[in-house]
Amino acid sequence: VGYDYQARIHGMAEYDGRMYLTDWYNKSVQVFTPSKMEIVFGEETHITSDAVFKYDDIQPLGLLAYGGELLMSVQKSGKIQRYDPETGDLLGVLAEFPGKEIGRMEIARGMLYYIDLKAGKLMKAKGE
C-alpha cells in the first residue's frame, strides 16, 4: 500500500474502526481509509520549506483514543488537547506540562504515560 502524499505522520490511534493519524507537516489530524487519507482536523496546506518548522498550537504529534475522544499532544507546547473524532472539534486542554515536548502517549493501569521528546524520557503524568 502506498500513497503519493507529502505527509509527516508522527502519531496514530484507532477509534471506532478508523485509523487517525497526526501529520505535523500539514498541521492536521487525518483519518486513514483503505483508498485515501482524508483530513479531519486542521488545514490542508502546501507549506513552503521556510514554514515547515514554524511551531504553533495546531501542529499535532501524539494521539491516543480514550473515553470516547482522542487525546492529542501539540508540538512544542507541552499541551494535551481533547479532540472529538466525530466532529473534528478541539474540546480544550486536558493537561499542560510546561517545558515538556509530548510525543507518544499511552494509558496503563489508569495512568497516562508519555514520551518527553525534549528529554528523551518516558514520563508518568500523575505525580511527576
Task: Please describe what each predicted stretch is.
Residues 26, 36-37, 47, 77, ...:
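Short coil turn/linker residues within repeat-based beta-strand modules
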Residues 2-15, 52-67, 97-110:
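Beta-rich, blade/repeat-based domains predominating
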Residues 33-37, 84-88, 126-128:
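Short loop/turn segments that connect beta-strands within beta-propeller blades
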Residues 100-128:
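Blade-level signature of beta-propeller repeat domains, shared across WD40, Kelch, NHL, RCC1
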Residues 1-3, 38-55, 89-95:
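A short beta-strand motif characteristic of beta-propeller blades
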Residues 21-27, 72-76, 114-120:
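Conserved beta-strand positions in repeat-built beta-propeller and related beta-rich domains
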Residues 12, 21, 32-35, 41:
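Solenoidal tandem-repeat scaffolds enriched in leucines and small polar residues
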